[in-house]
């Protein structure tokens, strides 16, 4: 049997841009993607800490070192610039893998720069 498990999360990142008229997606600074092991075009779930909205979309790369978290297209209706978000990826794992798996958690500062990377739970 396969279980769908949390792989990684970007914890309490700040939305820096919302563009309703872009095709769609979520732009994420490449430094954050690398830190979390996330990939461009990967499906993500987003949880808006500020207003409680929960939704999904996919990743596109934003400029490395920019601190960018941009919500595009319909996702731009779910958050405003300045909102705090949790961005998660999930993946299938065997029973054996899931028994010992520890998701990666990336904590950031106020400018969306990596502050700490740890395995969950700490």
From Swiss-Prot:
This protein's pathway: Cofactor biosynthesis; (R)-pantothenate biosynthesis; beta-alanine from L-aspartate: step 1/1
Active site: 25, 58
InterPro entries: Asp_de-COase-like_dom_sf, Asp_decarbox
Gene Ontology annotations of biological process type: alanine biosynthetic process; pantothenate biosynthetic process
Pyruvic acid (Ser) PTM sites in chain numbering: 25
GO molecular function: aspartate 1-decarboxylase activity
Compartment list: Cytoplasm
Modification comment: Is synthesized initially as an inactive proenzyme, which is activated by self-cleavage at a specific serine bond to produce a beta-subunit with a hydroxyl group at its C-terminus and an alpha-subunit with a pyruvoyl group at its N-terminus.
Cofactor: pyruvate
Main location: cytoplasm
A cellular-component GO term for this protein: cytosol
Catalytic activity: L-aspartate + H(+) = beta-alanine + CO2
Cofactor, how bound (note): Binds 1 pyruvoyl group covalently per subunit.
Listed Pfam families: Asp_decarbox (PF02261)
EC number per UniProt: 4.1.1.11
Sequence positions that bind substrate: 57, 73-75
Keyword Cell membrane: no
Entry function: Catalyzes the pyruvoyl-dependent decarboxylation of aspartate to produce beta-alanine.
Subunit structure comment from the entry: Heterooctamer of four alpha and four beta subunits.
Similarity comment text for this entry: Belongs to the PanD family.
Protein name (record): Aspartate 1-decarboxylase
Gene of this entry: panD
